[in-house]
Amino acid sequence: LGTKIKRFFKKIRIKRTTVLVLVFVFMSASLVRQLFELQIIQGEAYISKFESRTTKKRVIKSTRGNIYDRNGEELATNVLAYSVTFEDNGTYDSTREKNLTLNGIAYKVLKILESNGDSISTGFHIVLDESGNYAFDVDEGFTLNRFRADIYGEPLIDNLTKKQKNATADQMIEFMSGKEGFSIVLYGDNAYTKEELTSHGLPESLSKQDILELSKIRYALSTNSFKKYMAVTIASNISEKSVAAIRENQPELQGIDIVEDSVRKYIDDASMGPILGYTGQASSEELEELRQKNPDYSNDAIIGKSGIEKYMETSLQGTDGEETVTVDNLGKVLKIDDSTRVEPVAGNDTYLTIDSSWQSAIYQILKQRVAGILLSKIEASKTYDFSVNDAAQIKIPIYDVYNALIANSVIDINKFSDANASDTEKKLYAKFQQKQQQVFDTITNRLTAENPPAVKDEDDQIQEYLTYICDDLLRDTLGVISKNAIDTSDSTYQKWTTDKDISLKDYLTYAASQNWIDISKFSTEGDYLDSDEVYQALTDYLIDYLKKDTNFSKLLYKYMLQEDTISGSEICLVLYEQGVLSKDDGSYEALASGSMTAYDFMINKIYTLEIEPAQLALEPCSASAVITDVKTGDVLACVSYPGYDNNRLVNNMDTDYYAKLSTDKSSPFFNKATQQTAAPGSTFKILSTIAGMSEGVIDDGTYINCTGSFDLVTPPINCWNKQGHGEIEIREAIEQSCNYYFNMVGFKLGQDADGNFSENRSLSVLQKYASEIGLDKKTGIEITESAPHVSDSYAVPSYIGQGTNAYTTSQLARYATAIATSGNVYDLTLLDRQTDSKGNTLKKYEPDIINTVDVSQNVWDDIHDGMYRVVQTHRQFDGLGMDVAGKTGTAEVNVYHPNHGMFVGYAPASDPEYAIAVRIENGYTSGNACLAADDIFKYIFELTDEKSILTGVAASDTSDTSND
């Protein structure tokens, strides 16, 4: 057969090449037919199948309600902005491929944002600290443990293992970035190849900052892992440049989208920060609590974190809308189903009782007054001798002022070692390195020498270093010395805490032997170490830590100043080189040339308020004032100096600014008006009058002979007038603020029918009337307020505002309001009304009188007359131009800190409209609080030209007298 075929082909003479051509023609025809079938006949079906369409619901964000003052001035509003969202909508062959893809997308977006000055914004509690180390931005406690539970995927904190619950920031980043987490960085056999990294747009190595930012993004994305097609917001309020760049690169950024959003904008006024608070991304525990009231809160919800924003959260928060969309496998929206659209509903608006113009002006008044007091106490010296033993005489050495610039981080000492540091900064750093080596040699000796001296035998400088290391660092900051493990009755512990009659080495060695040392904080081999090995590991850890500890470095600079190793002029010049001050201010050249001394320079800058008291955080550095409408209990001003710029805390939070506020020694986050409690001083004598007259131990005809020293108790209590006031009655006693008179009232109230005195009897009467006038409870004000404390010991001193009495300025303002109204005790309020977004009133907040003090009118008459006399006899109110009634108070702290100055009162005296409470912490005397009150009265009643009150410079008149 084969032969026949061959003969056939020979016969028809067809060439082999012809056969090949025929075969190729046949195959091509088949291929064309198949392509026609695929592209023309079934093309749409295959395209539809490839697109893998998915229908999903998409959230339409609502806007938050606005906040206004009592006059309709905008305090908190919303502005249009753009946010970046990330959605995991990909399909992957493996977990490794998934992590590479998501990390690559995250890295590309991160670099686009960073190149345009934008940043990632997620609720994450790990940051890079000043030393470039991973650190938590919250203290140990519930919030941090909840964060740990979220990172380790545990629904309950109690489910955390001991290791997880004690995890450091480093350990948590290692977990998240490693194989168990998001595989951002892998090592050894698991390491990514160069080809894998390149193909996914990732570099061969990542900085610590990059690892942190990628961890933030992946963590945020993981919170929606159970809802894969729900996007999370990873950056807010981004620039137009970032918007354009991301849209341009969107084909490479699967799951990334730009969405219209709104961001919060506050009035540019630091005085409003503590009242308004700020918004931020909700934490897990916050979401858990809020979802009990409204289950619709999303994982990336923005909520009120403090202040009115927090208190009114559920009212201000709008209701999100939604729509159904069809998307392809790349996340591109193909269709919007308008029939399913639910429109978002804006949050309700809130109107406050606050007058924002008063608030701002009073803030300025307090700042000017505090600066004036500070200036009057600064002297050209290195140190102050506290052996003078008189708080009223305390002076502030100029060297303390120079040091304060470093101690309170006005100057950033970590910048001294930067490559681009100025010549002055480099010189300071070179001197610091020499000092640091000397000190480390000494500390190493004290930790390792055979018989180091007891701490009490060291000089003051070394004592401060060693005390800082043990108490501030190892115990309070790092928790290496466990407070809970210490036996406080132990004799060795007592040696350390009382007179330091023990060396640091001996104390730490003993602590290790008693298991007071938490080895897990610095060693992974704790179970295998004896006490000597524990101590050696601790020593190594300590020296290494101190090299990076900014707070310890600040101590070294303090003593470098004292030793004149560095000068005040050098420190002041750095203010310019770090941008704290402008070189165009007219002082730079004079300071740099030496024609202006550092002393004169600082005095000038404090006077002009270019350097504020709060920045220095010396004493005084803070003050507060609260004004109420006596007819309603409305709070018209609630001022805490220093405040803060809440615009820098919302949207893309300025983390450096937040960290600065959190560590600022003037405590701007601590509301001085509603959270700071202190003894009321002689302002409390009005309550003592009510108690004494109501209980019948005195009346308006009772005269008591003030001899200058009340000796019926031990120790005797001196009147401020040590020569005595002689025979005086109640109105004079209030006017003169006679300690003796009110000591006698407290003593009489503690006597029984036989004249026997009982502390408890006297205190119970005081507590009864404190409760009547509302001093035993919070005021009802809608921001964070500390609980008051009515004195429960030292009965007789308690009647002159000492003992253990402690109240906030807001509580003293309610007290003043009750006095002004002859007994009406209001729940104070910051809220006027709520409206919807169209202005329709939903709720009006009405005055709430919680009690009326049941006292005869003649008692009130005596009190009002006495308080009127107080103001008439205080020169600080000379020329005020209206009748005011009030009571001064000076609360003693101790001989190492200036007294607090206070004033409570109301005006006009005959027909009160407003009540006021002013406190200047460490303000030396009540006279300084009176001067602030005088300025406030002049402003709110428009008694003089505003410019003469709000001068913009430190007040030039101060008071050294209290008379209370």
Where are these regions (language model features)?
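Membrane-proximal periplasmic segments of bacterial cell-envelope enzymes
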Residues: 2-605, 615-624, 643, 746, ...
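Active-site SXXK
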Residues: 34, 72, 106-108, 246, ...
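Second-shell loop/turn segments in exported
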Residues: 54-56, 87-99, 228-236, 296-299, ...
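Active-site beta-strand/loop architecture of penicillin-binding DD-peptidases
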Residues: 65-68, 76, 261, 267, ...
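Conserved catalytic neighborhood of penicillin-recognizing serine enzymes
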Residues: 348-349, 394-444, 669-671, 698-766, ...
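Mid-domain, small-residue-enriched loop/turn segments at the edges of structured enzyme/sensor domains
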Residues: 622, 716-718, 722, 729, ...
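Short, well-structured active-site flanking segments
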Residues: 647-649, 684, 693-712, 823-834
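Surface-exposed acidic, glycine/proline-enriched linker/cap segments
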Residues: 654-674
